[in-house]
Amino acid sequence: VWATWCGPCIIEYPEFVKMQRMYGDRDFEFVSISADKLEQKDKALSMLKKKSSAVRNYIFSGKDSYALIEAMDPAWNGALPYTMLIEPEGKVAYKLQGSIKPLELRKMIAEHPKLGRYY
């Protein structure tokens, strides 16, 4: 989960695009959710184009951002960026509030038995 007004989100976003390119042929898909207000969708779309994002992107269209937070993770306090790795069956394998460490995350994906390996 990211937003155009979140500096760390903008900085780390290209890393996710890179990871999708690296692991896209495996059972891995990067999906982004913008926490920008729906009225700001053009700004969010512009940022995605600048970052060459060719992944599935959503913008939260609800009025209550707390509903998004509760749906994603009741333990999340709403600070951005927020990253989750979810296994194909829906189990959360990793979650982080704050900026990722790209190499650590890539290693975790590559070594995870359900995310980064070929069978």
Where are these regions (language model features)?
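Conserved redox-active cysteine motifs that mediate thiol-disulfide chemistry
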Residues: V1-K18
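Short pre-active-site segment immediately N-terminal to redox-active cysteine/selenocysteine motifs
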Residues: V1-W5, K37, A79
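Short alpha-helical
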Residues: G7, L38-E39, I100
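Sec-exported extracytoplasmic/periplasmic mature domains
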Residues: I11, K18-D25, K49-K50, R56, ...
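Extracytoplasmic/secreted envelope proteins and their assembly/folding machinery
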Residues: Y13-Q20, S32, K41-L45, I69, ...
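Thiol-based oxidoreductase modules, predominantly thioredoxin-like and allied folds used
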Residues: D27-K41, S53-K63
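Short, internal strand/loop/helix patches
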Residues: L45-L80
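Thiol-/selenol-based redox modules, centered on thioredoxin-like
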Residues: A79-Y119
